[in-house]
């Protein structure tokens, strides 16, 4: 008897791809054959094949924000992508198709529905993307990382790394700490210019004895400028291009200052760490603000728009924080974690395949 087959569709950004890879790993451990529909010229082309997963090529990308000329080409590009997707599905004949977001998922999902192949959709963000908003109408099951995102949606959470979920409870980690607060600043792999400029200036406004210990991840191309910014501010900080052991860094931190991508918010909850979210202001549909509110509305994190993140505000805000308060916020964040999201999404895919057989 041949192994059951799933076709995962996700592309464009790590926020779509990494959760899909987590589900893929669970299903492979259960004996499934996993293939991936994606654009080989985009990020999935770099991330998926090294994991031993075959990338089934489909070259399609969105036109939102690309101008009128690109919009005029959309019907032709979409028709071509749908024809390609139909052929790929006919060749593969998957038992179930999982759409994790990104424009490449749209033609594949539509063609899967037309072929009556079970379609499962998972939306990571608190505001659904364009592709998933449409595909949710065609899907057998609709899943999400946060509650209330899509009609018929089941909030199963976002898959996060096991090492974050395995961290001790915040009360255990924070116990016995003394001295300066430990602050971890993370701008993502490419860094975040607003954090790289504002945090050093804010710390310079604090009395030296009141300054926290800072580990600041900036992205490789921004590291020299960040080091210069701290030097000019007269502030000591551990500046890094990347942090290989993010779980360890979060475990040591009293406070995390970061963006609010879906995976970041889910990782904050999984780790149980106090966080100040500064959403990227140009995210489509301002979805990072909605992501951050999942925790901030529950007093399990703080949310500060970038437009009002001034050095003066941040210095005053940091000066008011205590380790006891941060521990309480971290504990509330941990209560919102859904550590078995990848396994639960895999369960749904298996159920959809069985019901169709």
UniProtKB/Swiss-Prot annotation:
Gene this chain is encoded by: murG
Residues passing through the membrane, by range: none
Membrane topology: Peripheral membrane protein
One Pfam family here: Glyco_tran_28_C
Pathway this chain belongs to: Cell wall biogenesis; peptidoglycan biosynthesis
Reactions listed under catalytic activity: di-trans,octa-cis-undecaprenyl diphospho-N-acetyl-alpha-D-muramoyl-L-alanyl-D-glutamyl-meso-2,6-diaminopimeloyl-D-alanyl-D-alanine + UDP-N-acetyl-alpha-D-glucosamine = di-trans,octa-cis-undecaprenyl diphospho-[N-acetyl-alpha-D-glucosaminyl-(1->4)]-N-acetyl-alpha-D-muramoyl-L-alanyl-D-glutamyl-meso-2,6-diaminopimeloyl-D-alanyl-D-alanine + UDP + H(+)
Entry's localization field: Cell inner membrane
Gene Ontology BP term (one): carbohydrate metabolic process
Alphabetized UniProt keyword annotations: Cell cycle, Cell division, Cell inner membrane, Cell membrane, Cell shape, Cell wall biogenesis/degradation, Glycosyltransferase, Membrane, Peptidoglycan synthesis, Transferase
InterPro entries in the record: GlcNAc_MurG (IPR006009), Glyco_trans_28_C (IPR007235), GlycoTrans_28_N (IPR004276)
Keyword Cell wall biogenesis/degradation attached: yes
Positions with a binding annotation for UDP-N-acetyl-alpha-D-glucosamine: 13-15, 125, 161, 189, 243, 288
Family: Belongs to the glycosyltransferase 28 family. MurG subfamily.
Record keyword Cytoplasm present: no
EC number: 2.4.1.227
UniProt GO molecular function: UDP-N-acetyl-D-glucosamine:N-acetylmuramoyl-L-alanyl-D-glutamyl-meso-2,6-diaminopimelyl-D-alanyl-D-alanine-diphosphoundecaprenol 4-beta-N-acetylglucosaminlytransferase activity; undecaprenyldiphospho-muramoylpentapeptide beta-N-acetylglucosaminyltransferase activity
Name of the protein in question: UDP-N-acetylglucosamine--N-acetylmuramyl-(pentapeptide) pyrophosphoryl-undecaprenol N-acetylglucosamine transferase
Top-level EC class as recorded in UniProt: transferase
């Amino acid at each position: 008897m041949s192994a059951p087959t799933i076709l995962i569709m996700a592309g464009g950004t790590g926020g779509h791809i990494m959760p899909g890879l987590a589900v893929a790993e669970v299903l492979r451990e259960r004996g499934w054959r996993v293939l991936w529909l994606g654009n080989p010229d985009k990020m999935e082309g770099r991330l998926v094949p090294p994991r031993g997963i075959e990338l089934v090529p489909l070259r399609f990308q969105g036109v939102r924000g690309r101008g009128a000329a690109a919009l005029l080409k959309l019907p032709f590009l979409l028709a071509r992508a749908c024809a390609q997707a139909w052929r790929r599905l006919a060749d593969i004949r998957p038992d179930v198709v999982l759409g994790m977001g990104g424009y490449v998922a749209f033609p594949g999902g539509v063609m899967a529905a037309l072929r009556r192949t079970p379609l499962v959709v998972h939306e990571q963000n608190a505001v659904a993307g364009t592709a998933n908003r449409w595909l949710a109408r065609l899907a057998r099951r609709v899943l999400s990382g946060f509650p209330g995102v899509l009609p018929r949606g089941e909030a199963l959470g976002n898959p996060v790394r096991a090492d974050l979920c395995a961290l001790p409870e915040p009360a255990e980690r924070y116990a016995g700490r003394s001295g300066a607060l430990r602050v971890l600043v993370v701008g993502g792999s490419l860094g975040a210019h607003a954090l790289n400029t504002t945090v050093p200036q804010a710390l310079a406004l604090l009395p030296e004895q009141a300054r926290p210990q800072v580990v600041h991840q900036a992205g490789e191309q921004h590291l020299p400028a960040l080091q210069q910014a701290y030097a000019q501010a007269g502030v000591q900080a551990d500046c890094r291009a990347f942090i290989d052991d993010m779980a360890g860094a979060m475990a040591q931190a009293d406070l995390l200052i970061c963006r609010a991508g879906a995976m970041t918010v889910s990782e904050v909850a999984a780790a149980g760490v106090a966080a100040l979210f500064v959403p990227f202001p140009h995210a489509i549909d301002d979805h990072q603000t909605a992501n951050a509110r999942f925790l901030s509305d529950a007093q399990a994190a703080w949310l500060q728009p970038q437009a009002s993140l001034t050095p003066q505000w941040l210095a005053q805000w940091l000066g008011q924080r205590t380790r006891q308060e941060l521990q309480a916020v971290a504990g509330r964040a941990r209560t919102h974690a859904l550590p078995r999201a990848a396994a639960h999404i895999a369960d749904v895919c298996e159920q959809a395949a069985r019901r169709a057989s």
